[in-house]
């Protein structure tokens, strides 16, 4: 995965060098590390549900604000690889998470309002996460490149909570946050995103009747990411145990989760568009 990340950045860097003389310094001066433009759009068009455990998106509102959305994406595209590589890991992650989420909204708008699911943007031969249409770091990247090639690359960030930060425009996905990710608050933001998702009983819960833990399919797909030792956690069961108070109500059930003596079932994933209804 490290080699994959280097390949992505080197490929992007080759293209970046061609235009570095003309736009690199300007991009360095103009880039807003607070991602204020993205926060403004999110605060306008993200609706919190269930006490902030989930969210829906006003895609119609984003469609009306397509120009500022594209301007924000253009600002991200203007950042040269050399500038990005000089940032802190937190600043890099915030940049990539915001780029992923804003690009996903833009992708939805290409077919909205006819679209009922992001999966409709794919085909039998390709998923919507594969095309390399996103201008970033001097090259063309796909959503998969950003998430799996950069954010999830082994030995780089090793941050499993990325799964609670990137949003796939679907009801089953962890919520689209109502503000941009920013470097100076990233640990707190990721902690809150995790708490929100784990407390949402529609997607993660202890089933008292069946005496088993029922988790989002995300943990089935990416369970290995929770074995890397982040915050001392080296197993999915240990991660669940750390969130026992959000997954269960009864003290006995919470104690069982913390003991690790339980089975896990994964819930079906809802790919319906997370549009405001």
Predicted regions and their residues:
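N-terminal export signals
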Residues: 7-26
């Amino acid at each position: 995965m490290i080699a994959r990340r280097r390949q992505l950045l080197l490929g992007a860097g080759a293209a970046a060098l061609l235009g570095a003389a003309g736009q690199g310094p300007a991009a360095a001066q103009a880039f807003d590390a607070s991602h204020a433009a993205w926060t403004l759009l999110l605060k306008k068009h993200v609706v919190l549900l269930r006490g902030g455990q989930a969210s829906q998106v006003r895609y119609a509102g984003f469609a009306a604000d397509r120009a500022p959305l594209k301007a924000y994406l253009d600002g991200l595209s203007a950042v040269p690889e050399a500038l990005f590589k000089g940032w802190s890991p937190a600043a890099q992650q915030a940049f990539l998470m915001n780029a992923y989420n804003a690009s996903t909204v833009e992708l939805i708008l290409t077919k909205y309002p006819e679209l009922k699911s992001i999966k409709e943007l794919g085909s039998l031969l390709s998923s919507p996460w594969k095309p390399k249409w996103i201008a970033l770091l001097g090259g063309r990247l796909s959503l998969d490149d950003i998430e799996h090639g950069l954010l999830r690359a082994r030995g780089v960030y090793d941050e499993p909570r990325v799964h609670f930060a990137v949003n796939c425009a679907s009801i089953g996905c962890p919520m689209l946050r109502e503000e941009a990710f920013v470097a100076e608050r990233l640990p707190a933001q990721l902690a809150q995103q995790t708490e929100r998702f784990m407390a949402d009983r529609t997607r993660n819960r202890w089933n008292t009747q069946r005496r088993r833990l029922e988790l989002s399919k995300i943990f089935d797909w990416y369970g290995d990411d929770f074995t890397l030792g982040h915050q001392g956690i080296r197993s999915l069961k240990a991660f669940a145990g750390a969130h026992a108070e959000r997954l269960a109500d009864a003290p006995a059930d919470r104690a069982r989760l913390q003991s690790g003596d339980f089975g896990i079932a994964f819930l079906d994933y809802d790919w319906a568009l997370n549009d405001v209804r």
